[in-house]
């Protein structure tokens, strides 16, 4: 009998281990699925910031937070205890590294490693927090004091954010030392020539590439020694923004770094409201800029297969008013959703400042309040859609296949200016993109660094290119561009090629090459003979059109882009045989049951765009059911289309300002738990077959919760509104 019991226990143990392994596999799959949404915070869990995304990215290893003394590990555990996956983030160009700068770590002061301007001023991010020239010693500090501790805490995803070197910096002793090591000759002041500027910015680029490569390689190796597979990500602004803000960062090159797993695209109102020129006017164009920013991040990673999170922020760093925040949040939110092959999101940074910060109630008052209930409700409806936002093969409506070429060297020519050549507000980039985008053409971006990937060229029929604001890093990229043209691609090259960076000592004018401009090397590969005049040239199965103007000329003055648009239209119609490009004033995309719309201003068509159907308005905190929605120029819309719900007999929450968990269904009953931050309202629309006979809404203690309810017979949806509770509100509906 004892032998039988032992045998039974052995079998039971084996079964239990097998079940545990299967469960582990299931959990692993669930973990992957449950890293769809995230937010970052330097604070522990609080009831008022319980956002209920999948991942809490815990920021900084410092053993403190605003309201008490907690270790880093304590903060991490506070989120784990509430069911969150936990990741880690810190700055790589700045951070609370006072122990490094003041000599506590290695006995040496390192304040001389800050980024310094021509005037001798250190560029500070905060008190005793300089922007850093990332020396190997600093990299060792990050490895030993940050990365090891994070991995020892059981965290397997590390984000080193914002690898930023200011273009105006480059005068510190630390930078001069790195210059000598990298180039083999003494430092040269960047303001003295375009040549020096180019050399300085290439070095800045290299230093942060090296820093990330060293840190990520170490993280993966140290993780493996602990039996962990550590993933490494870079939260970064877009190439569009860094170029416009005059910051140098590795950007696209990181997408091919072996130790790098992905990015967070840090696009929000603060980046997208940077003014640009179009039709002779300099102004904020938040939606359009955000669309190009997200696009440049998506195209940077798509050929490489790296993961991409898109970020939005319901507010911004600069103190403004709630009305302004709401308007621009809607614009950036819609812009991100118009990229249907990205479905992972950082739903917000810094929830503490969003939920607890005080901001003006309107532009014409100094009165400040915490986030209004109507806005927090709307925001939570929006971010909860991201938990199940589907990938989609659908495309934004409009003419497809037109792309603007970008390169990391966009960041190299921004500051300082030389020989009187200026590119106001990155107009040589926007001059290629905005004339199309503003006419309803969903223009793409293409990264020269990704030219070797065949996937880069998928869906690109017409490539818009200029070297007025950037230069190619190597000649191999030209071979890929030329091969694409010869196979049938259409290249539109726009540029006078007279900016001072054309003649910097680089591969196109050294080692036996003597081209006056890098474009001449490309034209030679394409079989075009000097003097490379404006005109059209047949190349293999493709065509090249040369325009001898700088792209900025299309936008700095009113009406100067019309010939440019005509040329592109003629190429699309007569060379591609694809008809006229479609000129319109709106972008529309369907993603599952979601309708995403943006209507453009500054367009000859000033009519609204009208959608019809059974629609829930997700920008309205009352989430009303509409028969149609009219969207005016300069506005966006985000709608749930009930007509596209696949199984209308299945009881389900369609829209909610809370995270829905623990769903249970039977023939005539639907139950679930809703969780969201304290001091916020929940609104939800629940699809059920018919009007409910009984509804019970209770808190986690079983006490009844006051609720507003109503039945909409046409849509077969039940509206429920109540005060949110992070402990959970139980809802039971019987019909």
Locate predicted features:
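Bacterial Sec-dependent N-terminal signal peptides
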Residues: 1-27
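Aromatic-lined carbohydrate-recognition surfaces of secreted/lumenal glycan-active proteins
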Residues: 31-41, 87-91, 159-163, 198-247, ...
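Catalytic domains of carbohydrate-active enzymes, especially glycoside hydrolases
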Residues: 33-82, 87, 149-157, 258-263, ...
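Hydrophobic targeting/anchoring helices
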Residues: 44, 49-54, 59, 161, ...
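The substrate-binding groove and active-site-proximal loops of carbohydrate-active enzymes
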Residues: 57-67, 123-141, 193-211, 238, ...
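Glycine-rich, aromatic-flanked loop segments that form ligand/cofactor-binding clefts
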Residues: 71-125, 157-167, 223-234
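Active-site-adjacent "subsite" loops/lids of carbohydrate-active enzymes
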Residues: 88, 92-153, 187-205, 213
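A conserved amphipathic helix/loop scaffold
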Residues: 471-669, 673-675, 684-687
């Amino acid at each position: 009998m004892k032998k039988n019991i032992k045998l039974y226990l052995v079998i039971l143990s084996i079964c239990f281990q097998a079940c545990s392994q299967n469960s582990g596999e299931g959990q692993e799959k669930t973990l992957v699925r449950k890293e769809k949404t995230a937010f970052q915070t330097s604070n522990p869990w609080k009831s008022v910031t319980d956002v209920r995304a999948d991942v809490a990215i815990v920021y900084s290893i410092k053993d403190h937070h605003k309201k008490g003394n907690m270790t880093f590990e304590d903060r991490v555990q506070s989120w784990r205890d509430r069911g969150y996956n936990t990741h880690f983030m810190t700055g790589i160009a700045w951070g609370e590294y006072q122990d490094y700068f003041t000599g506590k770590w290695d006995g040496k002061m390192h304040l001389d490693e800050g980024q310094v301007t021509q005037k001798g001023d250190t560029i500070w991010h905060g008190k005793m927090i300089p922007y850093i020239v990332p020396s190997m010693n600093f990299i060792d500090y990050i490895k030993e004091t940050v990365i090891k501790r994070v991995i020892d805490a059981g965290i397997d995803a590390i984000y080193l954010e914002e690898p930023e070197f200011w273009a105006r910096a480059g005068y510190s002793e630390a930078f001069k030392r790195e210059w000598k090591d990298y180039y083999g000759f003494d430092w040269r002041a960047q303001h003295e020539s375009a040549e020096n500027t180019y050399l300085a910015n290439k070095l800045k680029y290299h230093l942060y590439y090296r820093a990330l490569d060293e840190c990520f390689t170490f993280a993966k190796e140290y993780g493996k020694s602990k039996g962990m597979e550590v993933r490494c990500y870079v939260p970064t602004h877009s190439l569009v923004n860094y170029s416009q803000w005059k910051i140098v960062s590795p950007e696209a090159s990181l997408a091919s770094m072996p130790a790098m797993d992905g990015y967070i695209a840090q696009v929000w109102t603060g980046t997208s409201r940077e003014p640009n020129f179009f039709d002779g006017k300099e102004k904020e164009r938040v939606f359009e800029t955000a669309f190009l920013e997200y696009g440049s991040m998506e195209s940077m990673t798509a050929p490489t297969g790296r993961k991409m999170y898109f970020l939005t922020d319901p507010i911004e760093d600069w103190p403004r008013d709630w009305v302004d925040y709401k308007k621009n949040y809607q614009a950036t939110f819609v812009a991100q959703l118009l990229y249907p092959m990205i479905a992972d999101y950082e739903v917000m940074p810094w929830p503490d400042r969003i939920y607890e910060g005080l901001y003006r109630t309107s532009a014409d008052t100094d009165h400040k309040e915490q986030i209004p209930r109507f806005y927090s409700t709307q925001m939570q409806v929006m971010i909860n859609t991201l938990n199940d936002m589907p990938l989609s093969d659908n495309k934004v409506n409009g003419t497809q296949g037109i792309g603007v070429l970008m390169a990391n060297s966009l960041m190299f020519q921004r500051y300082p200016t030389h020989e009187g050549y200026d590119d106001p507000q990155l107009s040589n980039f926007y001059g290629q993109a905005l004339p199309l985008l503003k006419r309803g053409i969903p223009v793409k971006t293409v990264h020269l660094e990704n030219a070797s990937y065949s996937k880069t060229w998928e869906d690109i029929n017409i490539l818009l290119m200029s070297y007025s604001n950037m230069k190619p890093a190597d000649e191999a990229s030209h071979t890929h561009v030329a091969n694409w043209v010869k196979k049938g691609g259409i290249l539109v090259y726009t540029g006078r090629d007279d900016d001072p960076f054309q003649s910097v000592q680089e591969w196109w004018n050294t080692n036996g090459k003597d081209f006056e401009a890098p474009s001449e090397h490309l034209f030679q590969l394409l079989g075009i003979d000097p003097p490379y005049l404006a005109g059209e040239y047949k190349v293999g199965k493709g065509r090249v059109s040369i325009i001898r103007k700088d792209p900025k000329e299309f936008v700095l003055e009113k009406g100067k882009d019309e010939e440019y648009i005509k040329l592109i239209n003629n190429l699309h119609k007569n060379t591609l045989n694809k008809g006229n490009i479609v000129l319109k004033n709106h972008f529309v995309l369907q993603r599952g049951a979601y309708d995403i719309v943006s209507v453009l201003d500054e367009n000859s068509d000033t009519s609204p765009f009208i959608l019809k159907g059974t629609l829930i308005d997700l920008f309205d905190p009352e989430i009303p059911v509409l028969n149609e929605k009219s969207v005016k120029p300069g506005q966006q819309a985000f709608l749930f289309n009930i007509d596209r719900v696949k199984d209308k007999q299945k009881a389900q929450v369609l829209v909610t300002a809370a995270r829905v968990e623990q769903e249970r269904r039977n023939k005539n009953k639907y139950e679930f738990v809703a969780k969201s931050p304290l001091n916020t309202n929940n609104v939800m629309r629940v699809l059920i077959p018919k009007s409910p006979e009984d509804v019970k809404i209770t808190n986690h203690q079983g006490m009844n919760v006051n609720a507003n309810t109503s039945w909409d017979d046409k849509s077969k949806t039940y509206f429920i509104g109540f005060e949110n509770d992070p402990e959970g509100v139980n809802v039971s509906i019987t019909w």
